[in-house]
Amino acid sequence: MKLLIVDDQSTVVQGLLHCTNWAAMGFTVVDTALNAVDAKASLLRQEAEVMLCDIEMPMESGLDLLDWLRQRGMTTRCIFLTAHAEFRYAQEALRLGGFDYIMQPAPYEQV
């Protein structure tokens, strides 16, 4: 499965890239993005089957990005990473069709 990793913190992106054995789980990381704008460009070039995405990012949130995906009929499954425990984030993620919701900090094994 094709995976896109989106997080505004480059250390999180690099950690996810290098500390998780994606191939063993059947994933190929096709791209990474540090914001929603770059993620959109990546998705327009090549739609990922799964997107691992931070919710709180500058300019546009991960929730905005998922809404953009759904408006275009894209079926990418979204797993949100967030440090925010507020129920409204989880509720909105589910309303938009989010696949899962992981609280940070999370061990790489949990991801």
Regions found by a protein language model. Give the residues of each.
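A generic structural motif
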Residues: 23-29
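CheY-like receiver
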Residues: 40-41, 46-111
